[in-house]
Amino acid sequence: MARIAGVDLPKNKRMEIALTYIYGIGRTKAKEILEKAEISFDTKTDELADSEINAIRTIIDRDHKVEGDLRRDISMSIKRLMDVGAYRGLRHRKGLPVRGQRTHTNARTRKGPRRAIAGKKK
């Protein structure tokens, strides 16, 4: 089982798909990485040689932010927005949609379950 960026890649999947198990790598980045490493997209994870795994590791470490580093960067940028007092930071703090969506109706995922209003019944 190949272990890249602290993630165990599944054995029986194609490398193009297996790399997407790493946070921060989607299908497009996976294809770019495999092209740079000169590995076929259809190669299964368990068919890789150690040299090929090391090539993928070095490409990811050198060119891409993944896993913990990416998560930390995202949370730090959100924290920066909150500290500066930007509108987007306030929306993050209140748990509301950040990108201008309507909130009168909808936005239930971001706002959470409905809260009952006491004293509304007659």
UniProtKB/Swiss-Prot annotation:
Gene Ontology molecular functions: rRNA binding; structural constituent of ribosome; tRNA binding
Role summary: Located at the top of the head of the 30S subunit, it contacts several helices of the 16S rRNA. In the 70S ribosome it contacts the 23S rRNA (bridge B1a) and protein L5 of the 50S subunit (bridge B1b), connecting the 2 subunits; these bridges are implicated in subunit movement. Contacts the tRNAs in the A and P-sites.
Gene designation: rpsM
Disulfide-linked positions: none
GO cellular component terms given for this protein: cytosol; small ribosomal subunit
Keywords, comma-separated and alphabetical: Ribonucleoprotein, Ribosomal protein, RNA-binding, rRNA-binding, tRNA-binding
Native species: Syntrophus aciditrophicus (strain SB)
Protein's name according to its UniProt entry: Small ribosomal subunit protein uS13
Family membership noted in the UniProt record: Belongs to the universal ribosomal protein uS13 family.
Entries under HAMAP family matching the protein: Ribosomal_uS13
Subunit structure: Part of the 30S ribosomal subunit. Forms a loose heterodimer with protein S19. Forms two bridges to the 50S subunit in the 70S ribosome.
